[in-house]
């Protein structure tokens, strides 16, 4: 039976290669160790130096804070079986003369992968291997992963750049399965008169966020976003973060039906670049804001794969 399964897997692999699979994850010898050393767990977060923070601070000129996080609630779109339920409770009314009462809430949710979210490196693998070739099987416990937990990331402050691809294409929302090209990115940046720099947080406006809590079924079924070529081009600019106003940052489903969410592997596994998903970018786009100081901090979930976040753009 085992030999039969292996034979079938080999046939499947050969069929994929003969069909011209558009992207294949590089071998461990090609991608490891990472540029920051064999034991590194921070990846692109290493780009947040004091100089990078000071450079971001210089972009704050009018003191305006723009929220980039969606509201967490039961009516937001969910991928798969994820959920977010809030149950409020009256906990007590004390017996002191001022009769102070208290209320709390119980949240039932997958806190790392709902709403506006930050993808840590433990979130995605190539087979059994994470970023920097740490192994899932060697670092998995019931209460969290012992390597690459999102608690390692800390606060990130850097120059944020909005690439308004929807605006460049002259539409409110890109098509349901539109793959953003390198030419789209270059054209939008030229129109906005912006040049990408190492350490940037690159946020891509597709307009897909307009469907949030309005057409959830369509929102999660597919989405426009970057593909393999655009992702590799962006990562070549040495960003700290890649983000978008859709659920996976990338186009989904991928036009190549043989592969699933390859940009997740390209960013998180191969290159150690964190992703920001489900961002609220409509206000930035409407105001024509291309550069700003981005501030984001994942929750310190020990051994977690990611975190819901509420990033802000300050200008």
Q: Model segments located where?
A:
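Active-/binding-site microenvironments in catalytic and ligand-binding cores
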Residues: 19-315
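Bacterial N-terminal signal peptides
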Residues: 5-15
